[in-house]
Swiss-Prot record:
Residues reported to bind thiamine diphosphate: 74, 115-117, 147-148, 176, 292, 375
Subunit structure: Homodimer.
PROSITE patterns: TRANSKETOLASE_2 (PS00802)
Protein name: 1-deoxy-D-xylulose-5-phosphate synthase
The protein's required cofactors: Mg(2+); thiamine diphosphate
Cofactor note: Binds 1 Mg(2+) ion per subunit.
Annotated GO MF terms: 1-deoxy-D-xylulose-5-phosphate synthase activity; magnesium ion binding; thiamine pyrophosphate binding
Lineage: Bacteria, Bacillati, Cyanobacteriota, Cyanophyceae, Synechococcales
This enzyme's EC code(s): 2.2.1.7
UniProt cross-references to Gene3D superfamilies, sorted A to Z: 3.40.50.920, 3.40.50.970
Keywords: Isoprene biosynthesis, Magnesium, Metal-binding, Thiamine biosynthesis, Thiamine pyrophosphate, Transferase
Source organism of the structure: Synechococcus sp. (strain JA-3-3Ab)
Amino acid sequence: MHLSEITHPNQLRNLSLSQLRSLARQIREKHLQTAANSPVGCHLGPGLGVVELTLALYKTLDLDRDKVIWDVGHQAYAHKMLTGRYHNFHTIRQKGGISGYLKRSESRFDHFGAGHASTSISAALGMAIARDRRGENFKVVAIIGDGALTGGMAYEAINHAGHLPKTNLMVILNDNGMSISPNVGAIPRYLNRLRLSPPVQFLADSLEEQLKNLPLVGSSLSPEIDRLKETVKLVTAVQNNKAGIIFEELGFTYVGPVDGHNLAELLDAFELAHGISGPVLVHVATVKGKGYPPAEAEQVSYHAQSRFDLATGKPYPPTKPTPPSYSKVFGHTLCKLAERDPRIIGITAAMDTGTGLDKLKEKLPDQFVDVGIAEQHAVTLAAGMACEGMRPVVAIYSTFLQRAYDQIIHDVCIQKLPVFFCLDRAGVVGADGPTHQGMYDIAYLRCIPEMVLMAPKDEAELQRMVVTGIQYTKGPIAMRYPRGAGVGVPLAEEGWEPIPIGKAEVLRSGGEVLILAYGSMVHPSLQAAEILKEHGISTTVVNARFAKPLDTELILPLAQQSRLVVTVEEGCLMGGFGSAVGEALLDADIRVPLLRLGVPDVWVEHATPEESLAELGLNSVGIAERIRAKVEALQGQRASQAQAILGSS
């Protein structure tokens, strides 16, 4: 059977092992061809590692009834191909195409959407409890990676499920030893020992079957069989690094470890697990990037890939040179400063490469901490370090810092601790879509007392703000910066001067329209000013630098002299930078028209950053068009008012 003929996952139920193996090969081929030719890139390693797992599991389920919850979602590419999306799989992560993650609105087989890690067991348990309350009996399966299992939420769900012995729930642990980078911590180390242990549950259940088949006495031995099963499991566990005992003690029946690329073994394990009452965990050992040697060899870089040569695995060179990314400039600058200040500690939550902290990890490993997928712990860990005089720098994507909001308020801000938050991927992130957009940090941080917010206009100003953040000791401070390449300005290797807290700068003066731009929107605003000049509209452009505190000493007098004030930000309008300016104008009783440009109250779907910014009107052309339309509308209003005055006289 060809993969293109699969329109419903239940078609797998009647296929032979050889047919499943053929589908596994086809899935990998389709995935690789799509990744190699994608204009926006896509996740690769995670999906290649779960092909056999997906096929074997779906063969044992009735997916018209049963529900599978995938953690994060970037490991669910085979799932997408098997659930009616094969023919448009080539559009994945592109504007108007299918999502790179699971979306309930995209398919009836996507039972729970996710882009952040560690949520699957909680969601699956909720569905299982609801099922039992309604008296139904479908199966619920959560598939979670060992990286996501470093997140505390996963253990909260396991703790809850373990106290519900009558609630049937299967958790499949997809253990490849990686998140994006290699996993850290005691739990991954424990799981790695389990990967090397022979199956435990198989031994116990095999013994039970043999004893029950004894003539005359087999059926009367149930209590003794149970005790003997436990003895076998305990003895086996002790001999094999106590395999699975943690999960057993938490109330789960442990099955595994199972070879995640052996279809026959997977089928046996899943059928066995389906027959076990209560919560069960199936431990499946997989290889990230399985079936594509370059991805198996370079598991970090092939977690996700842009266009590459399928024959060699090497990425195609860029069509033109690009400036270094904000992340790389941040990592380089922090590393330079850390070399001279041993108090500086870089902290990340399983994203050392993505945040640029890999350079610090390599050069100064004693000044680098990776906590795993544990943002809450990262923030409070930093708070504890700050209490002891260290200078913790928490580098986290804007979207992931949301997960530690209580810790920011309760553990950092209330205590006025000098923790420096560096929010990568702030604003539009592109093909990852709404689960990863960094739209909300200005709003959710601006409302917190003691918090300082800043954003650089370019990569050179970012270097100065890194110094500013480290030197600021009066309380918490946050810096946001976008994904991707910098503007292309010259960069100094040292001698970066801090920026005075709350001080903006005028970049262009003398206009009747005042443009207050924040962070990544400064350069598009300067370009928009040139476009407006061609239409006879003069502008003053200010690099705000700080959303909190605002430079009211600079902004308010300029606003009083202007016919229109415009704020531009790459973030949500509700509660954002524009709201801060509006509040300041209102408090000062300055009555001037205000145009706020930013992200409206909508979810921004996946597309390239350029496509998203154009659609939002946040590129130079869009900014100029919105301002020009507003100026013309105001001129029309003034003309109408003047005409009304003349008419009344």
